[in-house]
Regions:
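Short, well-structured hydrophobic secondary-structure segments
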Residues: 1-41
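Ordered hydrophobic segments in well-structured contexts
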Residues: 7, 22-24, 45-49, 57-61, ...
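Structured, beta-strand-rich domain cores
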Residues: 30-69, 73
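Helix-rich interaction surfaces within compact, conserved domain-sized segments
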Residues: 69-116
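Intrinsically disordered, low-complexity terminal/linker regions enriched in Pro/Ser/Gly
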Residues: 113-125
Length: 125
């Protein structure tokens, strides 16, 4: 996208926890082991689709932010295989989830209303 390497994932609804689950890992070798993406993997942005009928939208996270939040590893240290995303319409009660929602929603564009959604999308891209 515009000369940048983007990774796309669709977040999954889980029945017992609020928010949606986004798997974000790679299989670097034929060994079968999985690992978090790393800052040096050449990914500029991660786009995650979140849907909860009738609402939907996308999170657009820059690589540097995912490193800062310890979701991407740096020099193969740290990182996560998956994490929860909290769209603006989700109301988590746990303090950690509320903190995550704050930084995540700064990178979210709701596309339910296309006119307004496209303007939001232009901001987060």
């Amino acid at each position: 996208m515009d000369g940048q390497t983007c990774l796309f994932r669709q977040a999954k609804h889980t029945p017992k926890k609020i928010g949606q689950f986004a798997a974000l890992w790679k299989r670097p070798a034929m060994s079968g082991e999985i690992a978090p993406f790393d800052r040096d993997d050449g990914i500029d942005k991660v786009i995650i689709l979140a849907e909860e009928h009738p609402r939907f939208g996308v999170f657009v996270f820059p690589c540097r932010l995912l490193v800062e939040k310890d979701i991407f590893s740096e020099k193969s240290i740290g990182g996560k295989h998956a994490f929860r995303v909290y769209a603006p319409w989700v109301m988590p009660s746990a303090a950690q989830a509320k903190r995550a929602k704050i930084w995540q929603c700064a990178h979210f564009a709701e596309l339910t209303d296309t006119t307004q959604g496209l303007a939001q999308l232009a901001k987060v891209l």
